[in-house]
C-alpha cells in the first residue's frame, strides 16, 4: 500500500528573491552619487522591488526624506542582488526624459533641515527661484565665448531689452572673465562661495545653485559635469525646454 500522506504539501517551496542592493561608496563624488541613486531607484521601480542602499556614514538621511522603495543601512548586508550599471542603463533607456524627471521629483525630496539651509542661502543672496531669465554653469574660461553667444541668441529670440543672468562658477577668474564679456544689458548674478572651506557648506550652496538653474526660464548646461545633469532632471516637466541648451550639443545622460 502506498505510504502517501494526504496532509503533506503538494506545492514546491517558494524561492525568496534576494533584495536589490546599491552601494553608494563606489560613487566618485556626491553629485554622481545622487544620479546613480536615482538610477537604482528607477531600476527598483521597474522590477517592482525594494532596494537596500549601503550608506555607512548616514549621508543620504541628511539629504532626502524617507522613500518606501529605498532602505538605507549602515552595515553591508548579505544575500543581495547588486544593481549594475547595465541594469540602470537599461531602465533609463526604456523610459522618456519626462518620466526620469518624475522619478527625480519623487526621490529628491530634501529634508526639512536641508531645505531650510538652502532657503537661507537664497535669501541671503536676495535670489528668488524662477525669477532669473537665463542661468549657466562655467567650468573653463575657454567656454565663455560659447556661453555669451547662446545668451545673446536667447535675448534676441525673446526680444528682451534687459535680462538677468545667473552665473554658477568655481573660480573667481571665471566670474571676472564672464563679466568682462557680458553685454551692458545683462544683470549678472552669482552667489559668493569662493571663501567656503567646509565641504558640507559648499555642497549645500551648490544645491541652492542647482535650484536656481533648475527654475530659471532658460539654462545652458554642460553634460560632462554631474551637477549640470542633475540640473536637467530637476527642471519641471511643465517648463519650456526649448531654451535648454547644452554647450556642445551633447545629449543628456544619467551616469
Outline where the language-model segments fall.
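Secretory-pathway glycan-assembly enzymes, especially type II membrane glycosyltransferases
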Residues: 1-151, 157
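Structural alpha-beta junctions
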Residues: 42-51, 152-164, 180-190, 238-242
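Short His-Asn-centered micro-motif
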Residues: 54-56, 137-138, 166-171, 220-224
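Short beta-alpha junction loops
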Residues: 55-62, 171-173, 249-252
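Short, aromatic/basic amphipathic alpha-helical patches
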Residues: 61-73, 173-185, 230-235
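Short active-site oxyanion
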Residues: 161-165, 216-219
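Donor nucleotide-activated moiety binding/catalytic core segment of transferases
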Residues: 185-216
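A donor-sugar binding/catalytic signature common to diverse glycosyltransferases
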Residues: 206-251
Amino acid at each position: 500500500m502506498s505510504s502517501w500522506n494526504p496532509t503533506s504539501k503538494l506545492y514546491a517551496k517558494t524561492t525568496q528573491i534576494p533584495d536589490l542592493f546599491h552601494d553608494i561608496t563606489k560613487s566618485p563624488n556626491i553629485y554622481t552619487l545622487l544620479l546613480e541613486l536615482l538610477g537604482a531607484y528607477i531600476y527598483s521601480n521597474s522590477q517592482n522591488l525594494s532596494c537596500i542602499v549601503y550608506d555607512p556614514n548616514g549621508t543620504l538621511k541628511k539629504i532626502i526624506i524617507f522613500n518606501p522603495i529605498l532602505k538605507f543601512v549602515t552595515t553591508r548586508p548579505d544575500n543581495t542582488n547588486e544593481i549594475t550599471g547595465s541594469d540602470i542603463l537599461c531602465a533609463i533607456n526604456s523610459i522618456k526624459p519626462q518620466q526620469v524627471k518624475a522619478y527625480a521629483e519623487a526621490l529628491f525630496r530634501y529634508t526639512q533641515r536641508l531645505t531650510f539651509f538652502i532657503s537661507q542661502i537664497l535669501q541671503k543672496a536676495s535670489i528668488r527661484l524662477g525669477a532669473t531669465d537665463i542661468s549657466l554653469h562655467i567650468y573653463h574660461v575657454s567656454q565663455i565665448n560659447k556661453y555669451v553667444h547662446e545668451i545673446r541668441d536667447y535675448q534676441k529670440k525673446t526680444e528682451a531689452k534687459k535680462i538677468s543672468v545667473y552665473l554658477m562658477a568655481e573660480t573667481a577668474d571665471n566670474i571676472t572673465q564672464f563679466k568682462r564679456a557680458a553685454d551692458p544689458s545683462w544683470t549678472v548674478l552669482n552667489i559668493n562661495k569662493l571663501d567656503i572651506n567646509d565641504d558640507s557648506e559648499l555642497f549645500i550652496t551648490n544645491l541652492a545653485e542647482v535650484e536656481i538653474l533648475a527654475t530659471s526660464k532658460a539654462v545652458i548646461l554642460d553634460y560632462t559635469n554631474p551637477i549640470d545633469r542633475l540640473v536637467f532632471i530637476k527642471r519641471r516637466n511643465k517648463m519650456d525646454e526649448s531654451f535648454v541648451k547644452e554647450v556642445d550639443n551633447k545629449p543628456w545622460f544619467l551616469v
